[in-house]
Every structure is written in C-alpha cells, then in structure tokens.
Amino acid sequence: MLKRGNVTTKLIGVGALVLAVAACGAPPAKDTPAGAAGTAKSAQELGGMDKLVEAAKKEGKLNVIALPPDWANYGEIIKAFEAKYSIKVDSAQPDASSQEEINAAKQLKGNDRAPDVFDLGLNVALANKDLFAPYKVSTWEDIPAELKDADGAYYGDYGGFMSIGFDAAKVPAPTSVKDLLKPEYKGKVALNGDPTQAGAAFSGVMMAALGNGGSADDIAPGVEFFKQLKQAGNFQPVDPSPATIESGQTPVVIDWDYTNAAQTEKLKGKLDWKVVVPAEAQIGAYYNQAISKDAPHPAAARLWQEFIYSDEGQNLYLKGMSRPVRLDKMGDKADKAAKDKLPKTDGKQVFQTQQQADKAKAVLTATWAQAIG
C-alpha cells in the first residue's frame, strides 16, 4: 500500500533537497514573512477573500511537502488549485513522514523553497505547535471542536477508519475482526506495515483490540489477537501493495478504508476488491493541516487552506475515498456519487487521544516482537 514515511529514504530525501537548494543558489527569504499575510489569522484580516487571492497570486508559488499524488487525491487537488488561481505548486518529497516535514522546515528555514504548509499526524502537530501560524479558514465553524486547535494552529483535514480489504473471489466477506481467525483465511491476512513504526499498522492493532474486548485505553487484546492469527497460520508477514493484492499474495489487507477503497477503483475489472469497516471495531484518525510561521509564501499558504476546506476542496478529498472533515456539515453540497462509494460505518466510532496513543505505543514496543516472533 502507499505509505507516507519510510524513514531511511525520506531522511536522505530531505538532505538531498537541502543540497539541491544550496546548489541552485536560491535567494534566502526573510526569517519572518513580510507583510500582513505573514500574520493574518483569517481572510478578513487581509480585507477578504479577494485581497487574499490577489496577494497569493502576486507571490505566484506555493511549496507543499509529503503529499503523494495517489494519497487522498492530492494529485488532483494540487492541479485544481493551480488551475483555479494560476499559482505554481512545488511538491517536494511526496513520501516524507510527518516528522520529516518538520525537519525539512527547520533545515530550509530562511530559504524560498521551505515548506509553506504541512499535512501532519496529530502527534507531530501537537509537538510542534510553536512552528505554526494560527489561521482560521472561512469554514472554521464546520470543523468539529475535537478535531481542531482552538487558536487555529492546526486542524483536521481528512481521515478515515481502519478497515479490512479483501478479494471477494478468494475469501468470504468478514463480518467481524474475529472472523479472520477462521480457517478460510489461512495464510491470507496482511497488515500494512510494522505497528511499532507505521501509523496504519498501529491502528490495525487497535482495531483488533476493539474487536476483542479492548478499548482506546487497552491495546493488549489486539496484540494477543495477532499472536493467535500468527499461531493459526492466517497472518501473512508481507508488506501489502497493489502488486501483492493483484497477484493474490495478500488477498486480505488491514489498512485505512481510503487506501483499501482506492484499490477497489484501481483493480476494477481485474478482481473484486471489497472493503468492510467492522462495526464493533471502528477506530478512526485524521491528518491535520498547518501553516508554517516561516512560510516564504504566506498568502498562498492561507489561500491553500481556504481552498482545501471549501466545498470544492473537500469534495476532491471525498473523490479520493478519504473522509473530509466537513463532510457532516456539507449536506447536499457533498459529492453524492463519491460519498456513496465510501465504506459504510455503523456503530460506535473511537478516536484516541494522544495520551491513549502514547500508552498503546509503549505496550506495542514492549510486546509486539515476541507476540508474532
């Protein structure tokens, strides 16, 4: 599956980006963005959207980082922004992790190729709030309070729920997490990554915990589940990818619903890939947008936020099978055809706090290797 953040590769990439900038001799930007755009906390503070658009077009450029074109439909989102505003988007290091976004911003501070905006996991956003410029988009009130910083330093943009993707021609449709222990799934169940390092895999173990008597505070039943899955011979220790799915090597994949659902579209006509979000184990998470306080293009950065939180931007996320943060407030403005393709969710939805996630990660670090060794 597509991942954001192979650490070794991305650290090399950030270093390469720094060297490339130095080689090009790009003129340094000021440490603090000049003009009102650098401190504006809303479009109104700049005189309204027309003034913001005018200022952004004058800058003429936007630097983004860690936005793979096939992830949450960012390829189309970037093209739509460029076409709408005639602003060039420079997309650097598309596979960088959230922490590597921050590392790049620190290393490139003062240069006109430094990231203007970030797309971050919550833990990294919380740890780096002092690097962000507070800004509230025009649709601020539509964003649930629990998914945004009260001051506008960062806020959820898109997310999803952990899911089970499966080849309907090779296995029966699972109706619960526990179904994966049945003989029909022998040698067929793959997890997207190492849960001690990858967010998707971590949430996969949390899903297993919820489906086996655990809670947001207790991941141990999830670790025990995967131990049983391994003992039953059902766990397939292969990193899933479109190629392993198409070849039949990984006919069952535990991953985010938007990445699994994207495979349904990609593999249409080749195999019948279906996705289910277990009703008893709905663990969700959102990525977060933030503007760099040192953004070399502060007006374009703010216009980017306005665009992706507009109906147009949110529908582009939806088209990419992710769940835009404003979806519940969009009503009939949401793209119905795209919305209808989302995996169904019925039941209690769980979103971990950072404290709960940190506790779970500590348990995983201490027990995972032994459980599946």
Give residue spans per PLM region.
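Extracytoplasmic ligand-binding site segments that recognize negatively charged/polar headgroups
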Residues: 63-78, 90-106, 112-249
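Bacterial lipoprotein signal-peptidase II cleavage site
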Residues: 24-34
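A ligand-binding cleft/hinge motif common to bilobed small-molecule-binding domains
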Residues: 123-129, 246, 251-271
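C-terminal motif of bacterial Sec signal peptides marking the signal peptidase cleavage site
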Residues: 19-23
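Short, polar/charged alpha-helical segment
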Residues: 47-61, 67-88
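Mature extracytoplasmic/periplasmic domains
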Residues: 282-283, 287, 291-349
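Extracellular/periplasmic bilobal clamshell ligand-binding domains
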Residues: 331-373
